[in-house]
Amino acid sequence: AIILKNKNYLFTDGRYTIQSKIESGKNFKILDYFKIINTNVFKNLNLGIDPSLFTSKQIKNFFLKNNKVTIIKENLVDKISKIKSKKKSSFYSIDKSIAGESHHKKVSRVSSFLKRNKYDYLFITAPENVAWLLNIRGYDNPTSPIPNSNLLLTKEKQVFLIVEKNKTTKLLSEKKLKQNQIIDPKYILDFFDKLKKGTIL
């Protein structure tokens, strides 16, 4: 979604167009998702972007052709949201018998893919994919156990979970992750600046 001073745009694919119109009413203009790429609908603006929600490639393709971008480290929607959930509750692991495969094997398979295709890093922005890779769940959404987080995986099988540290208590006690593998979203830009140069998928 793009929230402007006088207009709001919601981008979605054809499956959700009718539902989006019903739920958003007159508050948003509904557009097909593909129109967000270098769109002329909004231009000559300074757009605030949460860097934890987009890759640099997405920011370039979606917003930079006709606009300027300012990086905002705090999620403004979270600051004003009246929806209260168990956002401070720790993520938890699900058993291999439920997941079907250990997270170690999943990490190995994906890292091998990166090596074969000459990528150094995989940046995962979809929380459901983080949930699959690490076999974890959370309490962020009252209707879904998806753990709101991002993740960076290296071709050397290094895992960095990008999430508030208070959500990782159980994962740390299980020794699934170490302290240095937890990256607070507020410092994500500093984290990326310290990475070795390489290609990101």
Predicted segments with their positions:
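A composition/biophysics-driven feature that prefers long, compositionally simple stretches
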Residues: 2-201
